[in-house]
Swiss-Prot record:
The P/V/C gene has two overlapping open reading frames. One encodes the P/V/W proteins and the other the C protein. Keywords: Host-virus interaction, Inhibition of host innate immune response by virus, Interferon antiviral system evasion, Viral immunoevasion. This is Protein C. It comes from the Viruses. May counteract the cellular interferon antiviral system. GO terms for biological process: symbiont-mediated suppression of host innate immune response.
Length: 166
């Protein structure tokens, strides 16, 4: 429910924003790459690599703009979550490094520094003992909200995962 409210607020604040939905590969089924079974198609001319690099830079700039636009909408929501979602007392005192607002600020800063945050990063921090399980859950929720509000973030996360992010 909160994600839908945030998306509504985000859509009201954005102006002159257009998502690119025209995908030539899916619109033109005749253009298929001839490939031998068991072979991976990975050879690309230099001009294609330059085009890919330019496309990655363009996508990163769009992500920065999307994040800059959604940050003022998400910040009050994170502050509200901080006040309303107190951790239950379990008998153990767990020192938390991050709260909701700090997660938002951390992920925002990472994106502005052109580092693409993803779930694998949060899992690695958890396994390394840097953050607790609860902090990881909070970070994943904030990242999920950012993915829902910033359409470019999942695309760049995918490029990062397959090793094509330049």
């Amino acid at each position: 429910m909160m994600a839908s409210i945030l998306l509504t607020l985000f859509r009201r604040t954005k102006k002159k924003y257009r998502r690119h939905t025209d995908d030539q590969v899916f619109n033109n089924p005749a253009s298929k790459i001839k490939q031998k079974p068991g072979k991976i198609f990975c050879s690309a001319p230099v001009e294609n690599l330059n085009k890919l690099r330019g496309e990655c830079l363009r996508m990163m700039e769009m992500l920065k703009e999307e994040t800059w636009r959604i940050y003022p909408v998400l910040l009050p929501q994170m502050e509200l979550l901080e006040r309303e979602c107190r951790t239950p007392v379990t008998g153990q005192k767990v020192q938390m490094t991050y709260n909701w607002t700090q997660w938002l600020q951390t992920l925002y800063t990472m994106i502005m520094e052109e580092n693409v945050p993803d779930m694998d990063l949060l899992q690695a921090l958890r396994e390394g003992g840097v953050i607790t399980h609860q902090e990881q859950t909070m970070g994943m929720y904030v990242l999920y909200l950012m993915q829902r509000c910033c359409p470019m973030l999942p695309k760049l996360q995918f490029l990062k995962k397959i090793g094509k992010l330049i």
